[in-house]
Amino acid sequence: KGEDDVIIICEDEHVFTENYQRDKFLDQVMRCAQFGTQILFGGIGGFGKAVPIESELFWIDWNWCTQFMVIYQSAFDKILNTRFTKKDVVDEYLGKIIPNKVVIHPFISIQKEFGYSDITKGNERVGQIGKYFDDADLRLKTYEHIVKKYDIML
């Protein structure tokens, strides 16, 4: 319980994409704080529903498969008071208990594949994790296309 406004969690399989730009990312972190965001994800492998809230930012209802996240102070107590079990997949669990989640798209972070020791059963096939990110990317591109096609103001 310090004075941190945010904590960035970056797992060992994280790699920045060509979309990462330091100053732009910092602006997005600040902008999301104004929205009351509790977790900002740099990339995700799956999600339920998504709503564009601003250029390159989507609110999501739940998510899984992430390796880079910014956790805002407003989520600290909720996380610290949650009882995790050994079976919980932390990023997926956080996606369920924290309501105000946003993902940056195009993704600024993806998972590199290197032979995980902690991989979830079923995801051990080479290329599987990358496919999840590609599928999530395609879904978000579809939302972006609709916003542009119908000139929806964000």
Where are these regions (language model features)?
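An acidic/histidine-cluster motif and surrounding catalytic segment
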Residues: 1-10, 14-154
